[in-house]
Regions:
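Alpha-helical scaffold/interaction cores of sigma-54-like transcription cofactors
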Residues: 1-572
Length: 572
């Protein structure tokens, strides 16, 4: 059988590997791998890896490097139950709360390999895991082990042995040390010679095959995981939503409600109920209501959600969609099943209060901000490697000043003679540029999405890994592009500086109600016509101001933003 490495770390083990998912897949295809593993010290890259493998007809084997009692072990999931256990353990690892009792509790459907350097853990784990193997990475190590459960396992951090030097710079950036000031023993952490492995350790390859054959993860997609609002008096979500909307209709229009509004409300509620989104609307209604009751300024509504009469009657939006001929189908269409998307603007300084409210109401593990990843951009790579090389800040600043951030370092070099001339001044500068080019694009750090929040009816660590971090909240361990596929709904809580500015202005104007500003105030219209719109949301860009001048506006401004966006899309 063909050997496939079982201990591969990618750049998702931040600042510890030179391997990205795309290159790993290409390497696997070039070497005719039918299966492939990922074993980072977190699960950040699992979904990228899983979907890339599936797309390229490669069987994905999902693993996790776990640290217990200062020793590393590697776990692989056999199926979805094992995957859920990996998720849970990954979350606990972010809490620094891994122990043997927890390992014993979450051992089902997992395969364990204990690397040679952690061999003292083997006796503590052999009665926990049904499938457990003793790992080695050389003939010398193998001679010191006994049993028929031996397996070759070499931690892979880069493809070619000549790439070791690049990894050393990555380690330098991680630790903050100058590159030649520390020992770094990772010279053997490259892809092994497969022919050598197959000849030297042939008798143990049956154990590799066992892992390849028994790890068969199929992710569960499109689960029903929307958050659930607890309705009073044991009402179901549809009945309660309808009750609030009918009350809203009477509040806005009194007893004489136009039949157009009645019919539209009936239609929207039927669609919302049929698509299973009643709870979603109640959850949004609840946190918007909380914000308004606590004097947190909320925007009037944006995007396609403004086309929903239900949103209007729930006071989620403040624009009457029938009055302005806005289409509900742009928001929710029974012919096109997609998740609803209501973006809510909160004043910049108080957004976190609304997030905290949701966490307290629904549960710490049912609400989580969404993780994002920062990568080495061209200038960032130059600065980080320059510091590792102890090159003067003046020289680094000058070189960064020559770099166009829209281009890669290679493109910058090929298109800029001044960069070429500067690098020729000093061999260290050439070396800096070469190292930085190798690191460019690798993941560097994690951050939090500016607006995105995930909410669920189940603890999120049953579905995705979580990271314990910011303000003791959890963040998702997966980025937002995959969450909807798993059945999780992203909600946007946008922090808008303009709302904070309006709040401050309102303090100077007691009794003023900006919701009742007339649409035909021609003094205000003239301000827009003259493009004197600095600081006005969506009207302050250079392009919009030029558009306003060309338009020679003399009527209410409704629709201008939409026309401008459409024009920009057509130009693009």
């Amino acid at each position: 059988m063909n050997y496939v490495p079982l201990y591969i770390k990618t750049h998702n083990s931040l600042l510890s590997s030179l391997i990205n998912e795309d290159d790993l897949i290409n390497y696997a295809k070039k070497n005719n791998f039918t299966s492939l593993t990922i074993t980072d010290n977190n699960m950040y890259g699992v979904l990228d890896f899983y979907y890339l493998c599936k797309k390229n007809d490669i069987k994905p084997i999902i693993g996790l490097e776990l640290q217990i009692e200062d020793k590393k072990i590697v776990l692989y999931c056999k199926d979805y139950i094992g995957y859920q256990n990996l998720i849970y353990l990954s979350t606990k690892m972010s809490e620094n709360s891994i122990n043997l009792d927890l390992i014993k509790e979450k051992c089902a459907n997992l395969i364990c390999i204990v690397p040679f350097e952690s061999n003292e853990m083997y006796s503590k784990l052999e009665n926990i895991y049904t499938d457990i193997f003793q790992g080695y990475s050389s003939s010398e190590e193998r001679k010191k082990l006994e049993g028929n459960n031996l397996i070759y396992i070499n931690e892979v951090l880069y493809f070619d042995k000549n790439d070791f030097n690049y990894l050393k710079y990555l380690e330098s950036i991680k630790t903050g040390n100058v590159v030649n000031s520390f020992e770094f023993d990772k010279k053997r952490n490259y892809m092994p010679d497969f022919d050598y492995i197959q000849n030297e350790f042939r008798e143990d390859l049956k154990n590799n095959k066992y892992i390849y054959d028994n790890c068969n993860l199929e992710l569960k997609l499109n689960q029903q995981l929307l958050p659930v609002y607890e309705c009073p008096n044991s009402l179901d979500s549809y009945t309660y939503l309808k009750k609030i909307c009918v009350e809203g209709l009477r509040k806005v229009f009194g007893d004489k409600v136009n039949v157009i509004y009645k019919d539209r409300l009936k239609y929207e509620l039927e669609v919302i109920n049929k698509m299973g989104f009643c709870n979603y609307f109640l959850v949004v209604w609840d946190y918007v209501k909380y914000a308004k009751e606590n004097n947190i300024l909320v925007g009037p509504g944006r995007g396609s959600a403004a086309g929903s009469l239900v949103s209007y009657l729930l006071n989620i939006t403040t624009v009457d969609p029938i009055k302005y001929n806005l289409l509900f189908e742009r928001f929710l269409n029974p012919e096109r099943v997609t998740m609803p998307d209501i973006d809510i603007d909160f004043e910049y300084t108080r957004r976190e209060e609304v997030v905290s409210y949701c966490i307290q109401k629904y549960g710490l593990k049912k609400v989580a901000p969404i993780i994002t990843f920062g990568t080495f951009g061209a200038k960032q790579a130059i600065r980080d490697v320059g510091r590792a090389m102890n090159i003067s800040l003046k020289s680094i600043d000058y070189l960064c000043g020559l770099i166009d951030s829209r281009l890669t370092l290679k493109e910058n070099y090929n298109n800029n003679k001044r960069i070429q001339e500067y690098l020729n001044i000093n061999q260290n500068f050439k070396h800096l540029f070469k190292i930085a080019s190798k690191l460019e694009g690798l993941k560097r750090h994690t951050s939090i999405h500016a607006a995105g929040i995930v909410m669920s009816c189940v603890d999120l660590d049953q579905v995705i890994p979580l990271d314990r971090g910011h303000n003791d909240f959890y963040t998702t361990g997966y980025s937002m592009e995959y969450l909807e596929q798993l059945g999780l709904l992203k909600m946007d809580f946008l922090a808008l500086r303009n709302l904070t500015l309006i709040k401050e202005v309102l303090k100077e104007l007691p009794g003023f109600d900006f919701d009742n500003i007339p649409n035909n105030d021609f003094k205000a219209i003239n301000i827009f016509a003259s493009a004197n719109t600095s600081g006005i949301f969506q009207f302050e860009s250079d392009g919009m101001r030029r558009f306003l001048k060309d338009l020679k506006l003399n009527s209410p401004i409704i629709g201008i933003s939409a026309i401008f966006i459409k024009q920009q899309l057509n130009i693009g």
